[in-house]
A protein has these predicted regions:
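Juxtamembrane helix-loop junctions of ABC transporter transmembrane domains
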Residues: 5-13, 44-60, 83-131, 135, ...
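Helix-loop-helix
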Residues: 62, 169-183, 253, 257-328, ...
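Conserved catalytic Walker-motif region of ABC-type ATPase nucleotide-binding domains
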Residues: 118, 240, 390-392
């Protein structure tokens, strides 16, 4: 979860150590080469600056006093200075090029790791985290890491080496001037600590507000139709303005403090330079301690070089704090517990040989559960029939709030079970338990006599085709959207599935037919057409059992007939669980379960429930609300 607004990372030292550990693991050799190049660059510049003393004292000054001007020694000396700085330029160019590769490589590693972990997380994680906040990790937080790896870390190391080498050289040149320089630097450090701390706090708040704004924008983009239907454009704009104002305020404060710090330190550096020039000039004129004009020129250059990294460090502190805050969120994601799967029973294609079930490498239309025994006995194969039993099941999304109570039911192979009830009755929750998006607190769920906890989750879900009320379509062709149900399906199988779902007709009327690329989650398709594609996607998977969340309440009558006909074809011969939104679509169900506050209060066929004149009767006659 995100840090509290304005609160920095809890353990920056641990985060930095972990980040450096990842860098060294993936790019250890490159980092060492970069460090060597930085050291060479700094030492080359320091050597060039130190040589300036000799250049002035041993070459320029004697040349000015000499009556015969021989410039050859001076040119040789200038050539040596040029060599020093040339080496520095080459080293600087080299480490910057290497850091580009390291930075982009690490960002790729982070994104790969984040996406891999995201795919391993349970549905519960996405139910409890804003999607915009997760997206912000991939964009904003990784960008702060990019700045830290590519700029802040090399500059900090460069600054540290520069400060150490420059300090040594300044002490060698003149101790009193070095003490004066340190006094001014002390003032700069005090201001940096004070102002930098305030700035860092607001930069953390800025990161939090960016994630909030991103989340709201994504939510509004997805719900734009709803906004326009209810004419809530102004209200949405007002809500956005409040969030945007908070972001603007935190950004203003963060950058205001940050922007003040640089100029203040720069001016203090200039004051330090002027004071050293005045005092050093007096010392050089009086030749105090053998201090010369060349020594003064070198020292003033070192003074500038010393103040510059101090200023750079102060400017990079906020970038590092922001990056570590982003790294903390990324590492929190990477440290999330993946979805636990202790199952060992697998789903396999099967065939019969000599009256016995055996596995098949080809799709045969016959499925079996492969039960591998740990005691060395041969694998047992149990035919998948679609026999599902709930035995006294209790469930709550949190331990202190149970939403399903003592639910017991059974679905025989090929039966159609329908769930009806008001909003929050527990209809969708039951289907979430069947495919183990969540695990139950008490009781048992058996699938063909096997406790579903023993079945591998991927195999369990592969046996269950799901058609959701809100169909999600990917930014790919219609053909590939259908093929998503089974990636190895041929074009002929895709078109056959579309025909079974009654989707072939409208697909062929699209501009490029099956090759039409859908964008915006298929926004240019009607709800009914989207539902038909969802049915085709489930049909191509050819699952032994189905979970249908009907969406016929939001489509026209003609399309409803097409959708219902497609669903009927898909349900034929399969155990099917239906979340009903229209009672007219489930009258032919083998059993209808009426739920209320997480309990099954009625069950039976359509006719049996009408005869009871209970809750179902009220729903059917319009005396109660169905959702």
């Amino acid at each position: 979860m995100r840090n509290q607004r304005g609160k920095g990372p809890e353990n920056p030292g641990r985060l930095l150590k972990r980040l450096m550990g990842m860098l060294m693991k993936h790019y250890g050799v490159a980092i060492i080469i970069v460090a060597i190049c930085i050291i060479i660059n700094v030492l080359a510049n320091v050597q060039g600056t130190m040589f300036m003393q000799r250049l002035i004292d041993d070459y320029i000054t004697p040349l000015l006093k000499s009556e015969t001007k021989n410039y050859t020694p001076l040119l040789h000396a200038i050539g040596r200075v040029a060599c020093f700085y040339g080496i520095g330029i080459i080293a600087s160019y080299s480490y910057n090029r290497i850091m580009v590769n390291v930075t982009q490589g690490m960002l790729k590693t982070f994104r790969d790791s984040m996406f891999t972990k995201m795919e391993q997380l349970p549905i519960k994680y996405f139910d409890t985290h804003a999607h915009g906040d997760i997206m912000s990790m991939y964009t904003n937080d990784t960008d702060t890491l990019r700045q830290m790896i590519s700029q802040s870390m090399p500059q900090l190391f460069n600054s540290a080496i520069t400060i150490i080498s420059t300090t040594v050289c300044m002490f060698m040149l003149n101790i009193p001037l070095t003490a004066l320089t340190f006094f001014m630097v002390g003032i700069m450090l005090v201001l940096t600590r004070k102002i930098g701390g305030l700035s860092a706090k607001h930069f953390i708040a800025q990161q939090k507000d960016i994630g909030t704004v991103n989340g709201y924008i994504e939510e509004m983009m997805q719900g734009q139709r709803v906004v326009k239907v209810f004419c809530h454009e102004e209200e949405s704009k007002e809500a956005f303005d409040k969030l945007n104002d908070a972001l603007c305020e935190s950004s203003y404060k963060a950058n205001n403090y940050s922007n003040v710090l640089g100029p203040i330190n720069a001016q203090l550096g200039n004051i330090s330079y002027v004071l050293c020039a005045i005092v050093g000039g007096v010392l050089a004129i009086g030749n105090v301690g053998g201090f010369t004009l060349g020594g003064l020129a070198s020292f003033l250059t070192f003074n500038k070089n010393f103040n510059m990294p101090i200023n750079q460090i102060s400017m990079q502190i906020n970038a590092i704090v922001m990056a570590l805050a982003g790294a903390e969120r990324i590492f929190n994601l990477l440290d999330e517990e993946p979805e636990v799967d202790e199952g060992y029973v697998e789903l396999v294609n099967a065939k019969r040989e000599n009256g016995q079930l055996v596995p098949s490498e080809k799709r045969t239309g016959l499925w079996a559960w492969a039960h591998k025994h740990t005691n060395g006995d041969p694998t047992t194969y149990v035919e998948l029939k679609g026999d599902v039993v709930f035995d006294d099941v209790d469930f709550g999304y949190t331990d202190d709030k149970i939403v399903l109570h003592n639910v017991s039911m059974f679905a025989q192979p090929g039966q159609k079970l329908a769930f009806v009830g008001s909003t929050g009755a527990g209809k969708t929750t039951i289907t979430n338990l069947i495919n183990r998006f969540y695990d139950i607190q008490d009781g048992k769920i058996r699938y063909d006599g096997i406790n579903i906890n023993k079945i591998k989750k991927a195999d369990l879900r592969r046996s269950l085709g799901i058609v959701l009320q809100d169909t999600h379509l990917f930014s790919m062709s219609v053909r590939e959207n259908i093929r998503y149900g089974r990636l190895d399906a041929t074009d002929e199988e895709v078109e056959a599935a579309a025909k079974l779902a009654n989707a072939d007709g409208f697909i062929r009327r699209l501009p490029q037919g099956y090759d039409t690329v859908l964008t915006g989650d298929g926004a240019n398709l009607s709800q009914g057409q989207r539902q038909l594609l969802a049915i085709a996607r489930a049909a191509i998977a050819d699952p032994p059992a189905l979970i249908l969340d009907e969406a016929t309440s939001s489509i026209d009558t003609r399309t409803e007939r097409l959708v219902q006909d497609g669903m009927d074809k898909l349900m034929h011969g399969r155990t099917t669980f239906v979340i009903a939104h229209r009672l007219s679509t489930i009258q032919n169900s083998d059993c209808i379960m009426v739920l209320e506050q997480g309990r099954i209060i009625e069950r039976g066929t359509h006719e049996e429930l009408l005869e009871k004149k209970g809750r179902y009767y009220q729903l059917y006659t319009g005396n109660a609300v169905l959702a």
